[in-house]
C-alpha cells in the first residue's frame, strides 16, 4: 500500500470502509486518507441499455427501477442524458404530405400541457414537435418552419392552422379523420409507448424538460424504426431495438 500524496509505504493504517465496502487507509506521515481499490459506482453499460430499452418499450421509471434493482431517479437521469446526446430524429429526404395535430397531457400539479406534432403521411415519421402550455399560432408556425417542407398539409379545424405560412405548400382542413389518420395513429403511439402520457394514469411529467427528453428519445427510436421498415419491409423491427 502506497500513500498517493507522500508515496510512502510504511505506517499505512486501516481507517474503516467506504459505504460500498472498500477498505480505506490513512497515512500516518501526512494524514492523507485514501482508498487503494475503490469499487466503481457506475452501473454496467448493459444495465443502462436495458433500462432505456424498457423505457422506450412502455414501462415507467419506477417499474423499471424495481425490475432492475435501481433507483427511479437513476433511470430518469439516464433518459435525460441519452436524449441530450442524441441528434435530431432522422426524417425522410422528401415529404409530399404532412399532417398536424396535438396531444394534451398533464404536468406538475395536473396542469394541462400540449404536445403539437407534425407527421409524414407516407412513412409516419415525426417531422417536428413542440411542447407548449397554449396552442398559439407562433408555436405552431415555429414547428412548421423547422420541419421538412411538404407539398400538402392537413389538420383538424383548429383555427390557428389556417393562419400559418406553409412555405408554398397547400393547406387543407381534414373532413373528419380522413386526412389526419397518420398523425392520429402516431399520437396514439405516444400514449402507448410513453407511460407518462397514458390516459387516466398516475404517471405524468413533473417538468417540461423531462417530457421533452422522453419525447426526443422515443421519436428518435421510432423514426429510425419507420425508416428501417421502409428499407427492409420483410424484416420485423421493434422500437426498443433502435435505442
Question: Can you describe what each PLM-predicted range is?
Answer:
Residues 1-243:
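Residue-level recognition of single "structural anchor" positions
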Amino acid at each position: 500500500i502506497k500513500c498517493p500524496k507522500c508515496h510512502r509505504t510504511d505506517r499505512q493504517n486501516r481507517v474503516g470502509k467506504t459505504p460500498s465496502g472498500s477498505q480505506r487507509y490513512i497515512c500516518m506521515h501526512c494524514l492523507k486518507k485514501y482508498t487503494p481499490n475503490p469499487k466503481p459506482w457506475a452501473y454496467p453499460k448493459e444495465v443502462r441499455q436495458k433500462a432505456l430499452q424498457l423505457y422506450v418499450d412502455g414501462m415507467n421509471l419506477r417499474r423499471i427501477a424495481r425490475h432492475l434493482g435501481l433507483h427511479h431517479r437513476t433511470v430518469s437521469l439516464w433518459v435525460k442524458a441519452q436524449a441530450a446526446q442524441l441528434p435530431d430524429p432522422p426524417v425522410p429526404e422528401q415529404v409530399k404530405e404532412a399532417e398536424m395535430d396535438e396531444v394534451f397531457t398533464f404536468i406538475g400539479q395536473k396542469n394541462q400541457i400540449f404536445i403539437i406534432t407534425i407527421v409524414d403521411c407516407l412513412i409516419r415519421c415525426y417531422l417536428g414537435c413542440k411542447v407548449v402550455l397554449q396552442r398559439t399560432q407562433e408555436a405552431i408556425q415555429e414547428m412548421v418552419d423547422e420541419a421538412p417542407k411538404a407539398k400538402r398539409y392537413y389538420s383538424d379545424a383548429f383555427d390557428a392552422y389556417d393562419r400559418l405560412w406553409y412555405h408554398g405548400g397547400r393547406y387543407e382542413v381534414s373532413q373528419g379523420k380522413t386526412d389526419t389518420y397518420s398523425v392520429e395513429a402516431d399520437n396514439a403511439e405516444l400514449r402507448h409507448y410513453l407511460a407518462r402520457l397514458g390516459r387516466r394514469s398516475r404517471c405524468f411529467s413533473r417538468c417540461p424538460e423531462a417530457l421533452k427528453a422522453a419525447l426526443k428519445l422515443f421519436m428518435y427510436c421510432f423514426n429510425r424504426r419507420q425508416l428501417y421498415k421502409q428499407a427492409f419491409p420483410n424484416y420485423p423491427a421493434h422500437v426498443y431495438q433502435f435505442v
